């Protein structure tokens, strides 16, 4: 009997807690003291297993169910343990004897009576995993789609949509990097009154405030995020937040816990902009988290408000009452709810929670409603900036075009994001170059996670109110 590794045990506990509480595995990992108590290598391996299983659970079940007599009767903890071993064999190429032995012990740790079942099933997985990976078990007419689906760890409908979104096989295979950890970038606090000991050791920023990439384990262990000396923010997301930073009054819609709020306020300080920032989110809790971090970081000048962005007149009642007329903003920045298809490495549960109807109908309808509602709050000469972390045209260009064709969008014009005011400052030249590289002929920004080392998929449209 082999000894169960602490990393595999931690991964199982994290996945079960995430499943039981309806949380993301990454959030459970971050909150678990046990993840910090074990050896750093074990902790990293546990995270790799937990996030990998969360990302590929449907594919793993497809593999396992071939060898289970009664798949629906398998206890949740037993199934999760089997998934971990199947993930190791299918995606990490762990030798079968190791994965089977550890898988049996993992099952035994919570259900001794199921150890025999685990041994039989996992041996069959080990014998058949290569055929499964190459989709030699399916009809030739479906083989390419199924093979890519299994390679990427994605539902077939989502894989088919990705295939349809890119012109070349290479473009599709870019998403094979979905199972690799995403690179970490951070944005440093421009309001800090003294140098941070960790940030001061880093090389010069890529562009003002942005350090990328940074070592994830070293950075997290440094405590830089806990003391609000920086926020973790994808490089492409920082480019969008930077370009959206302008003088005057800004309404940020969909602020969440305030990562882009933090970035925009820091960039405004660096650029010397006089600015009043209102951060709106649907949830009170996220507004509170945003304000708490801003306060800790010493970042002033932000007001938060909670409410439904599809009902802005109701949400902004107090603003309107103070002014005696509808409040207008120089910038309205919408960080829209979306499929998250550009950030699946960071949120691995996304593919298995999404439906095709979400991408084609429900989300675009919501996004268009938010754009129309926000348009009425943009001052003449102001900017309406629409951003998603999706790579799908239905949520991006199609939503923008539908808005421009509507009565609410009639007074707006698409202008290149690279022409944003802040990007014309000399110190932001490199940021401007990065934005330009990600723009199409219309000036719409779209990044794609091109490989395991690249940053996330983001979209942004800059619309000026003439």
Predicted regions and their residues:
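S-adenosylmethionine
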Residues: 1-466
